[in-house]
Amino acid sequence: MPGMEAENSNASRAEELKQLANEAFKGHKYSQAIDLYTQAIELNGENAVYYANRAFAHTKLEEYGSAIQDGTRAIEIDPRYSKGYYRRGAAYLAMGKFKDALKDFQQVKKLCPNDPDATKKLKECEKAVMKLKFEEAISVPESQRRSVADSIDYRSVGSGPGSSYVPTKTTAVSAAAALMGVLVVYMGTKAATMVAAAASAALLVVLITFLWGRCSDGFFTKSRTLELEVEPQYAGARIEGDVVTLDFVKKMLDDFKNQKNLHKRYAYQIVLQTREMLRALPSLVDIVVPEGKHFTVCGDVHGQFYDLLNIFELNGLPSEDNPYLFNGDFVDRGSFSLEVILTLFAFKCMCPSAIHLARGNHESKSMNKIYGFEGEVRSKLSEIFVELFAEVFCCLPLAHVINEKVFVVHGGLFSVDGVKLSDIRAIDRFCEPPEEGLMCELLWSDPQPQPGRGPSKRGVGLSFGGDVTKRFLQENNLDLVVRSHEVKDEGYEIEHDGKLITVFSAPNYCDQMGNKGAFIRFEAPDMKPNIVTFSAVPHPDVKPMAYANNFLRMFS
């Protein structure tokens, strides 16, 4: 009986902790909620609800690997608990693992056949999978892909090709087959839809015939006119000749502040000029800060343009005497990502030494497709800019070393010891990030409080301890690691016995986290970090993720 009383007491206390965790979650205190759910699990580890709730909190912190683990554990405890599949499916979706997500949402639908929410999410997931299959079918091998940047000459108004590749006959048939797959899913087998299905099949025959012929006659290699002519009525910022000036940048910032777009011609010019500069850089860039001068490092901005302007208000505009390093994740989630990236690129064009840019995990096609940048670019500019930005992001350096003392990288360190700076310099970065290896780990890894290495809470990269940081610094004669990649309540966090600093520059992330932003100023020659924090500023009434995929917004 005493054992039963203790068990009942534990179960009762676990329920109390769950309620406290739920309250913390409602207050957007997701880390606190995770701690409380964990305490509940320690008292009662066979309650599927606790794991599903903790999975949801992990998802809010973008810890999708941990969310998948918790969802899986909830399913193991109770295979008929729909929320376990639901939470795991949502995490798979956020990672772009649509096929895995589809299996989970099919199971949710099976367990809850009359739930309209489950039906809606299953349909969205089916759309995502069909779109993925279609894109896979029409994708072009890297060896056949042409550079869209090389096809654009912004100086030649009204000319230039508008496509970066030529479809083959195989691609044409594959695309048609993929479209047929989409029709099969959405038309179903009901008699009422058979007429529509037949009509669509006829259209597919026409499509195949058209593509088959056009792949041979040069149709896809002919130029499409780019709309580069600046209309007389255009009243926005203008670049005179090839030189991006401070006056132009200031005018552009004022226009952006008032939600006015930059003309496509000047957007092309800025992006293409930036590409040329970035291509010439090594994968690891050495920065020299002269004695008596300072240097500022910023973390993730994530499309929060008005907070970026606030950084410049607090710390001055980028210039040769006031240089910055923005440490990746310029875009996605925030709905002013285009304004952010054009601002950073314009300053790079104005004065290359005024601003340095590092690649983050969100400077990639897979992330941009899900988290809003691709949709925003397509809405505000055009489809060709989607391809162009993807190319330019592949040119971004992966890491920087300041005055041979401070190593700056978006994510973190490595799954093996002995990595030297020369190994990072040798990385061929001109590609989409791989799912493993040094490049992946530079962009995705996170520190952990315990020594050694562990699995990534994100499901990509790894977690590394203070001993790993210490060895890396010693082996490369460095003093400090600065990284970004994680929301911190105060905008920064100092870890690993002061040898690692996380800096995050997007305050009140996604309009809901309530965190501060921060940046770090280093003064030469001692290069001691001076951390400045700041709060979010108002922005126009455009919600974060406004351009993201529908299915992701449904889980936000």
Swiss-Prot record:
Free-text activity regulation comment from the record: Activated by linoleic acid, linolenic acid, oleic acid, and arachidonic acid (AA).
Entry's Gene Ontology cellular component terms: cytosol; endoplasmic reticulum membrane; nuclear membrane; nuclear speck; nucleus
Repeat (TPR) residue spans along the chain: 14-47, 49-81, 82-115
Gene Ontology terms for molecular function: metal ion binding; protein serine/threonine phosphatase activity
PROSITE patterns the record matches: TPR (PS50005), TPR_REGION (PS50293)
Domain of life, per lineage: Eukaryota
Binding site for Mn(2+) 2: D329, N361, H410, H485
Listed CDD domains: MPP_PP5_C
Binding sites annotated in the UniProt record for Mn(2+) 1: D300, H302, D329
UniProt EC number: 3.1.3.16
Assembly with partners or alone: Interacts with PHYA and PHYB, mostly when they are phosphorylated and in Pfr forms.
Name by which UniProt lists this protein: Serine/threonine-protein phosphatase 5
Gene name of this polypeptide: PP5
